């Protein structure tokens, strides 16, 4: 797949009507676990693109550029809303959290196997041990509070096992800063991986920031609060890997390229025919 060689949709077709805007949620008892993680991943990717676009727009005085950013951003917002509403109302926040941590473990491990930059691989390997711990602790909390086994939610695809103990996760903020990519032309896979994992971990961080206060018991609130602080460290670590000398426009191009790659990847691997159609539609938009 090379989005630079594919004919794009006309920009007038980027917006969808209200009927197409509304989507039926997946069935939480039947959904493939990786369908859930794909939805979480792309939700976070769209969130990152929307807020990057907002920050870009606020930092430039070119009104024509700001209009184009606003135009694309509305489409990104529609995509994000569609993805958000694929989650069913009867899937609890804790069940959904298991999906977040399954994504963290499997995505981090997958990217670590594919990157070329040893510094990026080291960052991924380091955080992976903490992602395993987070999945294990949330699974334990799910079993304790509801009797539900997280192994069913992850479909047996992801091992639920202790990782680095959470007490060892808390570090001084300075220690979360890694060396950024400084090569003039870093490997495309390295650029993609660093941007993908930053957006994914940022989505997890934001989810925990807003979920912690929902829990009626102190144990749950403390759990989300503590792991949420670790996610801040992960986002700081991954964000520090990004190439700092890129212009805003270059970064905008990378953000759009990341979306193309991920939507294509989701389409290629999706097993749910209806959801696969959504990935195809959004890939064509990108």
Model-based region annotation:
Residues 1-286:
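Non-heme di-metal
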């Amino acid at each position: 797949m090379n989005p630079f060689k594919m004919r794009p949709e006309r920009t007038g077709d980027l917006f969808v009507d209200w009927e197409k805007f509304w989507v039926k949620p997946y069935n939480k008892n039947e959904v493939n676990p990786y369908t859930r993680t794909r939805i979480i991943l792309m939700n976070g990717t769209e969130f990152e693109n929307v807020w990057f676009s907002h920050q870009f727009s606020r930092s430039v005085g070119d009104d024509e550029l700001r209009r184009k950013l606003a135009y694309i951003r509305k489409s990104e917002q529609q995509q994000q809303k569609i993805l958000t509403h694929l989650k069913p109302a009867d899937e609890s926040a804790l069940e959904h959290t298991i999906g977040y941590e399954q994504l963290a473990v499997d995505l981090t491990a997958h990217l670590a196997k594919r990157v070329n930059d040893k510094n990026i691989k080291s960052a991924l390997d380091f955080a992976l041990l903490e992602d395993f711990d987070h999945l294990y602790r949330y699974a334990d909390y799910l079993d304790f509070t509801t009797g539900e086994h997280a192994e069913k939610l992850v479909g047996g695809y992801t091992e639920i096992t202790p990782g680095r103990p959470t007490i060892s996760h808390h570090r001084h903020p300075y220690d979360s800063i890694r060396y950024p990519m400084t090569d003039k032309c870093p490997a495309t896979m390295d650029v993609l991986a660093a941007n993908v994992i930053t957006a994914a971990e940022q989505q997890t961080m934001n989810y925990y920031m807003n979920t912690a206060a929902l829990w009626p018991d102190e144990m749950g609130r403390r759990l989300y609060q503590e792991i949420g602080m670790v996610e801040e460290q992960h986002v700081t670590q991954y964000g520090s890997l990004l190439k700092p000398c890129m212009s805003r426009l270059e970064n905008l191009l990378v953000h759009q390229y990341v979306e193309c790659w991920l939507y294509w990847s989701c389409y290629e691997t999706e097993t749910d025919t209806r959801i696969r159609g959504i990935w195809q539609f959004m890939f064509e938009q990108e």
